[in-house]
Amino acid sequence: MSSKPDFSSEASFSHESLHEELAGVARAASIIAVGNIISRVLGLVRDIAKSYYFGATGLVSAFNIASKIPMWFYDLLAGGMVNAALIPVFSSYARAENRRELWLITSFLLTLCVAILTPVVILGEIFAEQIAWLVSGGMTVETLKITAKLLRITLPAILFLNFAGILAGLLYSLKRFVLPAFNAAMFNLGIVLCTILFAKSLGV
């Protein structure tokens, strides 16, 4: 007598697998949502701290310009690629047997990032005053000098922000959501703490 396949056990297994997958998606979405909310709140605190310690002065404008330029490069490169390209590519190699290829791809992207962005940073350091003038919108000469000085300090962040974007895509593909979800929140928290601790002694 031939045994009949146990479809009920297969259906039960499929249901449990689907339930686990949906629970994982819900958990990941919750972590990302909490990270975004905390980041927004800390962003508001950051702006309040800057206004409190420096007021509506040219110093705030100088800092805003110097900090936004690295963010422009991040949004243009790694920030824009994470959801569109990096996560799908990384996810296709996320299985344990493909981890070697995953590390090779990550290493290649980080190396490519250094090769492309290092000359950009160097040129930015050389022409910081000209860049500050282009994006300043009619600042005074003194504020323009401060902007150029701050820009030379913040330009290397172009490299680190894009590194963080690539590694965030890697962590998302490996289903590790906490660190990349709170990445922006930690960035804003760092600015808040530095403003509170060093505003009076170091200024902007």
For the regions a protein language model found, what residue spans apply to each?
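Membrane-embedded alpha-helical bundles of multi-pass transporters/translocases
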Residues: 2-204
